[in-house]
Design a protein with these regions (language model features):
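A short helix/loop element that forms part of the nucleotide-sugar donor recognition site in Leloir-type
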Residues: 194-208
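Nucleotide-activated donor-binding/catalytic signature segment of Leloir-type glycosyltransferases, i.e.
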Residues: 247, 255-281
Length: 387
């Protein structure tokens, strides 16, 4: 099967998401996959435009997989980037339909996904709108968010099927008008995220002793991530053997560094910066409890369930999270997830939980989410659209 994917983030630079796992695994099964992507961090690069670029045989997770990544030309000028995207991505979609002749098109974005859905409908090509996030809420220019939602609704109307990564997100897309919906949950590589991975080297590298209890966070360090509140709570003189290990970069990184310096927390709060995906399992193994302390009223956190939660659970790690609706709906109670009202409460909850017992519950809950099973379900969905 020939599969064309369109998305509005950088396929190569960003950490693996649902689409990376699925598409690479599909190529291992003999399917051909081409991806049209967009350098969302273009403001950090020099120059006024990027020329069209094609990377053949790219993989992020599986060395044997082969995905072609196409980055159309864009103008890197504020307020002109979106119009240029409309022009060049529309042209690229039409080019791929003519040259590649895809059997199905799958969209993970807003603008280029809308363009692809229109063209797919016109050319009578099955189109899947795959939701792993509420994307219009992530648009940095607030004035464009309403337009983003309008395009999402229009794309839903053009879609053959709408897939959501969790049930809360399925409710959200139904409210936007989606009818033919399906939930295909996040997958886990149960071999890679093995609870028996040794972590002594990581603990030694970061000065973590055997008697220390480590809280672990990984991901983009948004200001609403709740990490600053936890660091400040640690500064109040809690258990000296409680440490916070943070993997990632982002908006709150500098402020976290300042908090660490001003409160002499260098031995209690560890910032590793960005790490490769292959390093993550050993880092998770070095922790005792994983956390997602995002502000519970943050809009973009209401309907999502990050894949990393499943990966933590696969490694027998209990997870402490604020009461986020998507996560509460997905996991419920007594499945290795512990809920708190606000970020600073994570510290107090960590004293209460039975780490081993909750970790076992977590592992048991996610064992059904092995990537091979998720890929089977997704592949069957694609094949059914061909009938």
């Amino acid at each position: 099967m020939k599969i064309l994917v369109v998305q509005e983030s950088d396929w190569i630079k960003r950490n693996p998401h649902q689409q990376h796992h699925l598409m690479e695994r599909l190529t291992l099964r003999g399917h051909q996959v081409k991806v049209i992507d967009y350098p969302i961090d273009w403001k950090e690069e020099k120059g006024r435009y990027n020329r069209r670029n094609v990377v053949d045989g790219y993989y992020k997770i599986h060395p044997e997989s082969r995905v072609q990544v196409i980055s159309p030309t864009i103008l890197k000028i504020p307020y002109f980037s979106y119009p240029s995207m409309l022009f060049y991505h529309r042209r690229e979609v039409k080019r791929q339909i003519k040259e590649f002749e895809p059997d199905v098109i799958i969209g993970f974005g807003i603008i280029n996904t809308y363009l692809a859905s229109r063209t797919a409908k016109k050319e009578k090509i099955p189109f899947i709108y795959y939701w792993i996030d509420v994307l219009h809420m992530l648009i940095p220019e607030n004035g464009f968010q309403a337009l983003g939602e309008y395009l999402e609704r229009a794309t839903i109307k053009n879609s053959t099927q709408v897939i959501a990564i969790n049930y809360k997100l399925e409710d959200f897309v139904k409210a936007l008008g989606a009818k033919n919906t399906k939930v295909i949950g996040a997958g886990i590589d149960l071999g890679k995220f093995d609870p028996n991975i040794k972590s002594s080297n990581i603990r030694q590298e970061y000065g973590i002793n055997n008697e220390d209890t480590v809280l672990f966070f990984m991901g983009h360090l948004y200001n609403f991530a709740g990490l600053k509140e936890i660091a400040l709570e640690l500064a109040k003189g809690h258990n000296p053997n409680l440490k916070l290990l943070i993997v990632g970069d982002g908006d709150a990184y500098q402020e976290l560094q300042d908090i660490i310096k001003e409160n002499n927390l260098s031995s209690k709060v560890i910032l590793t910066g960005l790490k490769s995906y292959n390093e993550i399992p050993e880092l998770v193994a070095a922790s005792d409890i994983c956390i997602l302390p995002a502000y519970p009223d943050e809009k973009i956190m209401q309907d999502i369930v990050p894949i990393k939660i499943y990966e933590y659970m696969a490694m027998c790690k209990p997870v402490i999270t604020t009461k986020l609706p998507g996560i509460m709906m997905e996991f419920g109670d007594d499945n290795g997830i512990c809920y708190v009202d606000k970020p600073s409460d994570v510290i107090f909850k960590s004293y209460e939980i039975d780490i081993i017992a909750e970790g076992r519950k977590a592992r048991k809950f996610v064992e059904k989410n092995d990537w091979s099973k998720i890929t089977n379900e997704f592949e069957k969905t694609l094949q059914d659209l061909q009938k």
